Amino acid sequence: IVDVGPEVSERGRKVISSFVRENQEFDDLEHFIENVRKYDPYRSREHIERTVKYNMIQRVDGKFVSKCDSNPRRAGAQGQMAEKDNVTLEEARSFDFPVLILRGETSNILEPDAATRFRDALPQGQLIEVPNCGHNVHSQNTLGFLDAVVPFLEGLN
């Protein structure tokens, strides 16, 4: 489980929602790239440019927009739907299998104390804090992500 849990930071959610809302369309891709660099300082410019190449399209009016429909995120529907689908700490106590929780060192979504409570609720829970990344562990520190996940997977029967 990567940087989420039964208790997610509302402050962090608002930061992400705000970024999505404020970055809907652009006249110039460079403007979007600079916004992403400010928002996500762990990602290299090359990585952001590659992401932009595959995830943005230019409309007939010349504006650049995401290929993904962001309306549910803009409307806040995603957060409301996710809330009712979240596993509670009480439910986590019944998970009778190994669970690895990864938390980004500077995550604004899964706070350290919430990650610890989640791990403690899991009978076979492990928690690893991956350095040099925030919420997007896999893309902000891919090697750190793999260093955590591979041994866990290799240890499963």
How does the language model describe each region?
Residues 7-9, 109, 133-136:
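Active-site loop signature of alpha/beta-hydrolase-fold enzymes
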Residues 17-22, 31-43, 54-57, 76-82:
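Helix-loop "lid/cap" segments that line or gate small-molecule binding pockets
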Residues 58-120, 126-129:
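Conserved serine/cysteine hydrolase catalytic core
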Residues 27, 110, 140:
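Residue-level signal for the nucleotide or nucleotide-sugar donor/cofactor binding architecture
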Residues 124-157:
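Catalytic active-site module of serine/aspartate enzymes centered on a nucleophile-bearing elbow/loop
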Residues 1-4, 106, 130-132:
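Active-site loop/turn elements of alpha/beta-hydrolase fold enzymes
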Residues 1-31:
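Flexible "cap/lid" loop of the alpha/beta hydrolase fold
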